[in-house]
Amino acid sequence: MLRILTLNEGTIVKKIDELGFESGIIYETIITSLDRLGKPHAATMGALFEKTSDSVLFKIKAYPLSKTGENLLLTPFGVLNVTDPELLVEAALDLCANFDYAESNSIKVPRLSRATAWIEFRVINTSKHDELIEFTCSPVYVGHLEVKPKPYTRAVFALIEAAIHASRIKPYKNMGLIDKASELCESAKKYLEIVEKVAPNSRYASLALKIKEKYL
């Protein structure tokens, strides 16, 4: 049985407001969950927030046979991690085995130790949308670290888009949507060209090479 020590709704809404989450925007995050053996798993997922003045929910979608989908159906608790863009790319490349975890504040599912902010949640509803399961999630705790701002480079944006597009190629192929898979492949290549142009011989270029080797 999971131990739940929740913040009150008003505090949660305030903290999520302070982090800058807005309704109607999909944010790229890393969701951590637990499998049936209690082993943590991390995966990149888009989260769509729905906020009112006194409540907040967010929705994520996963393939039912994906690790995250299976885990949340089995144990309906998880952590939404806000991270450095590089960590998002590593998660999209399935380099999660190298991730370090830290104890969460209210649930047994751990957060990422490198998360700059995190939202611990419970799943309150599931519904089927085409080939995906939509999980409606209710935050139970919100935490964050004090972080220093970083200068912006187009390489970060392009790298994230390339990783997201590339990671979806195989699922679309498996569903027989070859044209869509080809479209994603071409998009990923264009974004990687931006990385190579604005950040050659950098850690971003190294990650771009890993995306090429794994997906393209």
Where are the model-predicted features located?
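Basic, polyanion-binding surface patches
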Residues: M1-W118, R122-L216
